[in-house]
């Protein structure tokens, strides 16, 4: 799907997160649950799916004809980063055909010492046609990631970083300001 067609398809719609970590009730070793959730979301009018792990993304893409935002969640020692942190994970997501590749776009450094903006630049250099989403917590992070090449900026990390602790409610003023100042398309959570 071309970039503009994808933008048009998801604009103003609901993207449903279909993911379960190993310690959560909907996780199964063999998979199969997340594609069922994605089917239910598609039947209910979702315009896209957000999914974690190559296995679940691959199964979801076989089950529904919706754009998939793909991530790999993994904890790394010495950094609070956990959403698609390394180029190895990027390579795996690109190989499984994610429509939008999401990375953590917060101000913390990655294990290799790079910033979110530097990581996005490296992704775009390696995969210039791959759509990239930066999961951010602040307006400054969103702008920096967009300027580095992120096609989308998500409010995913708002309330989950030291700078934004306590921002648990839906913050329409934040979303509005981000959409006014950030050159990328905004995906609000």
Stretch-by-stretch model annotation:
Residues 99-112, 146-174:
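Glycine/Thr-rich beta-alpha phosphate-binding loop at enzyme active sites
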Residues 1-95, 126-132, 140-147:
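Conserved N-terminal beta1-alpha1 strand-loop-helix module at the mouth
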Residues 116-125, 137-139, 151-155, 165-184:
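Short loop-to-alpha-helix "cap/lid" segments that border enzyme active sites
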Residues 29-33, 81-88, 111-115, 166-174:
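Alpha-helix N-cap and loop-to-helix initiation/capping positions
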Residues 53, 72, 105, 136, ...:
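Short secondary-structure boundary segments
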Residues 93-137:
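Hydrophobic, well-structured mid-protein blocks that either form specific transmembrane helices
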Residues 47, 65, 99, 151, ...:
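Receiver (REC) domain switch/active-site residues of two-component response regulators
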Residues 187-189:
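Glycine-rich beta-strand-to-loop/alpha-helix junction loops that act as flexible
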């Amino acid at each position: 799907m071309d970039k503009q067609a994808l933008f048009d398809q998801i604009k103003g719609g609901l993207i449903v997160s279909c993911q379960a970590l190993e310690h959560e009730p909907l996780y199964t070793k063999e998979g199969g649950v997340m594609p069922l959730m994605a089917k239910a979301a598609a039947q209910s009018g979702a315009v896209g799916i957000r999914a974690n792990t190559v296995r679940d993304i691959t199964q979801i893409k076989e089950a529904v004809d919706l754009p998939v935002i793909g991530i790999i969640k993994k904890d790394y020692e010495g950094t609070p980063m956990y959403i698609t942190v390394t180029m190895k994970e990027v390579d795996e997501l690109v190989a499984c055909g994610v429509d939008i590749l999401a990375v953590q776009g917060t101000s913390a450094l990655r294990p290799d010492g790079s910033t979110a903006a530097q990581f996005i630049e490296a992704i775009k250099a390696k995969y210039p046609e791959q759509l990239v989403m930066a999961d951010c917590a602040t307006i400054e992070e969103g702008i920096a990631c967009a300027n580095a090449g992120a096609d989308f900026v998500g409010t995913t990390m708002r309330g989950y970083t030291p700078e934004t602790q306590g921002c648990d409610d839906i913050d329409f003023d934040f979303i509005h300001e981000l959409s006014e100042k950030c050159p990328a398309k905004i995906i609000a959570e």
